[in-house]
């Protein structure tokens, strides 16, 4: 208590030298009383040290627990968000790919079966013997060459550059077989009405029924029925079976020329029966085509359903984690 009063603070470094310490005057009670006071002060010092240690330990533990809880919650939330996002992306990609593959496989298999059915019934219904079984044994048939019942023309040269520079609504049909044979659309209209087109080069011998305004490229032949005994749709179905048989495959590019097309012979039942058969086959063909067009739409719809349920489950899991963390903190 007394020593600090004699410290020399005038120096740069405060000090209390030995000679000055020896000169400090102190008052003392009797020895017995000194000993009692010293014992009391020692006990008090020990208690203070113990209390300080206990308080320090408690505060450290409490602070550590709070910091640990906060850091754990924060870290858990961050990790959960990162892992959930990563997992969600991976699952979404895997499930979407798997779903697309499964749907494509299923729908493609369905399409193949439909096409087989269509080909079977088309060939069955266009067979003379079967037509007589269905409509009567005495049904008469007439045989014509294509040149006897149709006007035969060929398309003109229409380049891709011409299509780009003359955009419009009317399709240009070419030797292509995808996209219904359409190469593009222009303002011009070379044909308007009910026609049959066939590919003359490349994928030669592919036949299409047309009804409306259109144009044809130079690799596309065009037939216009001129005989009132012939149904254009029925003729198109017959040619889909017969025309490929006359394709010249010895050249570098397969061909079915106007001259060869003109010589093809075909047999026809009465017009009324032609129309009935054509309506049946046309409806069946449309059903197959609708299925083809519906595949991408079906896949897209299933993907949207997948995304919805993924998001729903992800949000539910996040909510459960938040509730669990809140309960633990409380």
UniProtKB/Swiss-Prot annotation:
Keyword DNA damage: no
CDD domains (alphabetical): RMtype1_S_Fco49512ORF2615P-TRD2-CR2_like
InterPro entries referenced in this protein's UniProt entry, alphabetically: Restrct_endonuc_typeI_TRD (IPR000055), Restrct_endonuc_typeI_TRD_sf (IPR044946), Type-I_RE_S_subunit (IPR051212)
One GO term of the biological process aspect: DNA restriction-modification system
Coiled-coil ranges from the UniProt annotation: none
Transmembrane segments: none
Key words, A-Z: DNA-binding, Restriction system
Pfam families referenced in this protein's UniProt entry, alphabetically: Methylase_S
Up-regulation conditions: Detected at low levels after 6 but not 96 hours growth (at protein level).
An MF annotation (GO) of this entry: DNA binding
Keyword DNA-binding listed: yes
Family listed: Belongs to the type-I restriction system S methylase family.
Database matches in PANTHER family: TYPE I RESTRICTION ENZYME ECOKI SPECIFICITY SUBUNIT, TYPE-1 RESTRICTION ENZYME ECOKI SPECIFICITY PROTEIN
Subunit structure comment from the entry: The methyltransferase is composed of M and S polypeptides.
Domain notes for this protein: Contains two DNA recognition domains, each specifying recognition of one of the two defined components of the target sequence.
Function comment: The specificity (S) subunit of a type I restriction enzyme; this subunit dictates DNA sequence specificity. As the bacterial DNA is methylated on this sequence and this is the only type I methylase in the genome, it is probably responsible for all of the methylation on this site in the genome. The R subunit has multiple frameshifts and is probably not expressed in this bacteria.
Protein name as annotated: Type I restriction enzyme MpnII specificity subunit
Organism of origin: Mycoplasma pneumoniae (strain ATCC 29342 / M129 / Subtype 1) (Mycoplasmoides pneumoniae)
Lineage: Bacteria, Bacillati, Mycoplasmatota, Mycoplasmoidales, Mycoplasmoidaceae
């Amino acid at each position: 208590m007394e020593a600090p009063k004699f410290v020399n603070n005038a120096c740069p470094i405060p000090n209390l030298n030995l000679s000055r310490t020896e000169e400090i005057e102190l008052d003392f009670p009797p020895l017995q009383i000194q000993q009692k006071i010293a014992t009391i002060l020692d006990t008090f010092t020990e208690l203070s040290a113990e209390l300080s240690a206990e308080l320090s330990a408690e505060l450290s533990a409490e602070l550590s627990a709070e910091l640990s809880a906060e850091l754990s919650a924060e870290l858990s939330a961050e990790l959960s968000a990162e892992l959930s996002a990563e997992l969600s992306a991976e699952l979404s990609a895997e499930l979407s790919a798997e779903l697309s593959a499964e749907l494509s496989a299923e729908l493609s298999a369905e399409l193949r079966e439909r096409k087989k059915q269509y080909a079977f019934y088309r060939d069955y219904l266009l067979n003379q013997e079967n037509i007589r079984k269905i409509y009567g044994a005495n049904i008469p048939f007439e045989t014509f060459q294509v040149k006897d019942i149709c006007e035969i023309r060929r398309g003109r040269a229409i380049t891709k550059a011409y299509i780009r520079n003359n955009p419009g609504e009317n399709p240009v049909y070419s030797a292509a077989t995808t996209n219904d044979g359409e190469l593009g659309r222009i303002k011009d209209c070379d044909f308007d009405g009910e026609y049959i087109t066939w590919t003359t080069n490349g994928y030669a011998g592919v036949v299409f029924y047309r009804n409306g305004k259109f144009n044809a490229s130079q690799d596309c032949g065009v037939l216009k029925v001129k005989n009132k005994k012939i149904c254009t749709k029925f003729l198109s179905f017959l040619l889909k079976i017969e025309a490929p048989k006359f394709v010249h495959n010895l050249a570098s590019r397969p061909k079915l020329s106007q001259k060869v097309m003109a010589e093809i012979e075909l047999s026809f039942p009465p017009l009324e029966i032609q129309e009935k058969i054509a309506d049946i086959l046309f409806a069946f063909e449309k059903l197959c085509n609708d299925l083809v067009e519906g595949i991408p739409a079906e896949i897209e719809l299933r993907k949207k359903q997948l995304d919805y349920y993924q998001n729903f489950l992800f949000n539910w899991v996040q909510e459960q984690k938040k509730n669990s963390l809140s309960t633990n903190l409380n």
